[in-house]
Amino acid sequence: MVQVELDVQDCFLESSPEAAQASGYIDSQVSSATWEDWFHRWLEILDSSLPPAPSYEIGLRLTDDTEIQAINAQYRQQNKPTDVLAFAALEADLPQNPEMVAEPLYLGDIVVSINTAQRQAGQQEHSLSTELAWLTAHGLLHLLGWDHPDEESLIAMLQQQVVLLDAVGIKININY
């Protein structure tokens, strides 16, 4: 059984409770327990692509367009908001150190803009929680080394996201 320690930081709610209430985010907010359940199920599905470890650690930061734009500018030289950023801790195959195998393996951080997710949910005509799950699953795949430099790999990644969402009871229609 795959174990995951998830650190959820809801900076969107913390920084602007009024905006969160006005936008309807509070009604669509995903609980920490739900996030943990989703990540646990997703990592069970993706187990064959996980490096060996007794457990895994992931950071999830929910934020706004202003913060994600600053992060995007700093790390990707793209001075604009985006929907999701993933910062993988394991960019290369690491040699197996017996001492490291005894500790949780840090996979990286996922940052999601609630503002952008809300816009995209409206465009896709599904709920904000569905869009958050979609974006977070996308970020998780990036943490595990998935990428989409071409159409074929993008389609494979999107198909895997559909599988991940289906595993947590979320049905989504995506046009490839």
From Swiss-Prot:
Q: What is its main location?
A: cytoplasm
GO cellular component, alphabetical, reads: cytoplasm
Provide any one GO MF term from the record.
Answer: metalloendopeptidase activity
Which PANTHER family does the entry link to? Answer: ENDORIBONUCLEASE YBEY, CHLOROPLASTIC
Q: What does this protein do?
A: Single strand-specific metallo-endoribonuclease involved in late-stage 70S ribosome quality control and in maturation of the 3' terminus of the 16S rRNA.
Which HAMAP family would you find in this protein's record? Endoribonucl_YbeY
| The protein, known as | Endoribonuclease YbeY
Say which species the protein is native to. Answer: Trichormus variabilis (strain ATCC 29413 / PCC 7937) (Anabaena variabilis)
